[in-house]
Design a protein with these regions (language model features):
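A solvent-exposed interaction/effector surface
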Residues: 2-200
Length: 200
């Protein structure tokens, strides 16, 4: 019995230490910069800086069907599946535009231009420059799935309608954690706003 207790405590200690290192790595990962313009009860308004993204369009719909395939394709590119066998740093969050078609995006680290990026060996991967934009975002914890994404999308949409804030109706899922980070997971649903005024 004593041996079992000791082993259990040892395993728990290892898990806690390993997860603390994972969390530290997540915090230090370059993120898409934004400024919070206004905070509401259920969501906040952000101004995102211009950024360059690598992206891929997926035939499958929904988070469950698309997330694994899209991640593997884009991760392959930044891990060296490109014309120069060049590794590119991971950034956060991973963005998924969910709708009739699904797109996944990784932000390109600051300092790169499209001309400087190595061409992907996978021709499905494209680069996209996104200009400064205003977005509304709602956060939720835990593991994401299609039901949670639909639930929080509906909450955000209803909250925006209640405040008479116009939006594009093109919602995205933002995931901030690697799959091996088990606690304190951060997920968001975001949508670009139309002619937003900070006076609302």
């Amino acid at each position: 019995m004593k041996t079992t207790i000791i082993l259990t405590c040892l395993i728990l200690a290892i898990m806690i230490i390993s997860q603390s290192f994972v969390a530290k790595g997540t915090k230090e990962t370059e993120a898409h910069a934004y400024t919070v313009l206004k905070v509401y009860d259920q969501f906040e308004i952000r101004k995102y800086a211009p950024a360059l993204f690598s992206g891929v369009k997926l035939k499958s719909k929904g988070y469950k069907e698309s997330s694994g395939k899209g991640f593997r394709m884009l991760a392959g590119y930044i891990f060296g599946n490109n014309e120069k066998n060049q590794k590119i740093a991971m950034t956060t969050p991973v963005v998924m535009q969910l709708g009739d078609t699904t797109k996944m995006f990784f932000k390109v680290p600051d300092g790169y231009s499209i001309e400087e990026l190595p061409q992907p060996n996978d021709t499905n991967i494209v680069f996209e420059k996104q200009e400064e934009k205003i977005m509304a975002a709602i956060r939720f914890n835990g593991w994401a799935d299609d039901d949670k994404i639909k639930h929080y999308t509906a909450i955000l949409k209803n909250a925006l309608d209640k405040e008479n804030i116009q939006h594009t109706n093109a919602f995205s899922f933002l995931g901030y954690n690697p799959p091996y980070e088990l606690v304190n997971r951060r997920n968001e649903i975001a949508v670009e706003l139309i002619q937003y005024s900070n006076n609302k």
